[in-house]
Curated annotation (Swiss-Prot):
Tissue expr: Expressed by the venom gland.
InterPro entries: Peptidase_S1_PA (IPR009003), Peptidase_S1_PA_chymotrypsin (IPR043504), Trypsin_dom (IPR001254)
EC number: 3.4.21.-
Full protein name: Thrombin-like enzyme TLP
Primary location recorded for the protein, binned into one broad class: secreted
Length: 36
């Protein structure tokens, strides 16, 4: 909402969740096991 596009690998902790229908959520990588 009101954001800007970023380059691939610009935000290394950003998580993009999707399924066969497409994008459904985003999150932040906390460590190698956890996404919030």
């Amino acid at each position: 909402i009101g954001g800007f596009e970023c380059n691939e690998h610009e935000h290394r902790s950003l998580v993009y969740l999707y399924n066969s229908a497409g994008f459904f959520c985003a999150g932040t990588l906390l460590n190698h096991e956890w996404v919030v």
